[in-house]
Amino acid sequence: MPPQPGPGRSRAVSGTSVGMFAIVVLIWLLSLVVVALPAYGAAWLAGWEPVTVTILACAAWTASAALVVARPVEAALARLLYRSLRRPRPAELARIAPALERVCRRAGADPGRYLLRVEEKRQVNAFALGGHVLAVTRTALELPDDLLEAVLAHELGHHRQLHPLAIILGWWYLLPFEAGDRLVRAIRRITRWLARSFGRLSDRTGGLAGGRGPEGALGMLVLLLLLGVLVVAGTVLVVVLGVVWLPLALLVRLAKVLSAALSRAGEHAADRHAAELGYGPALIQVLGLFLQVERSVPRPRGMAALLRSHPSCQARIEAISRGRPMGR
């Protein structure tokens, strides 16, 4: 059996972890721009001190991330993001808890710090979320003990190296961009609809002389003028937002690409963690369950490949085989 870390080493920050948190910092800084602009504008319109309000808004937004790592909020977020996630039933808990305890004993970690969850899916899978959530699918519970422990050792590796914490913080700080992107898209749709309405109304006003009364003609012209103003205003707003939004969107896309690359590196790091605990051969067996399906699906290319969060199972098996220690 490989050397076991001491009980005090429940967390281990790696280069991958540092890279992930660096991306979180970048996303946080960019999110401050998205938060600051409307805060400044709203304060200016309300007659308040814009700079003070903007600073307070940015500080509140920064501090809000502390909510994400609170255990009750973490559990609620996990349920929100994974609809079929639930607490383990007594029989399931009797299956997971001893397996996790054996893995944590090898790793020198405290099994009591983790929130165990079961996902209702008919495939072998598991994931770690935030600082505490550790979930397995119902089908994963049907694995033999050594394979289930290998899956848990992999997810424990993510938690020990803080990967899920960085991912959930990055997700949280990306929310303003998601809201801003939806707003820009909505403005574009409304502007296009107004432009089409303006065109149809312009065609109709061509027949104003054909029997329409002066009052009706005047009303149509006023409506046409109003629509024209709205179309121009919407177009200007779309252009201005595009000029402001495009650099931010490009930086966010770059951050997502880098984050995906680090996520793939994190998977290899979690595999190494499991292998160092002696679960390398068992983890290879688990990954082998996905090889046939993986080979039948076309490999992603272009941006899809860059945004892929997991390396291929074949690549992971080869990496574990090259570096795995002897043992269980």
Positions of PLM-derived features:
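Catalytic Zn2+-binding segment of zinc metalloproteases
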Residues: 156-175, 280
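Peri-catalytic and regulatory segments of divalent metal-dependent proteins
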Residues: 70-165, 296-298
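Transmembrane alpha-helices and immediately adjacent membrane-cytoplasm interface residues
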Residues: 50-83, 101, 247, 251-259
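Canonical alpha-helical transmembrane segments of integral membrane proteins
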Residues: 25-40, 175-182, 219-231
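Active-site metal-coordination segments of metallo-dependent hydrolases
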Residues: 82-97, 255-273, 308-311
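Metalloprotease/metallohydrolase-associated module, dominated by Zn2+-dependent proteases
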Residues: 2-6, 188-282, 287
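Active-site-proximal gating segments in proteases and membrane effectors
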Residues: 107-131, 257-261, 274-328
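N-terminal low-structure segments adjacent to metalloprotease catalytic domains
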Residues: 1-67
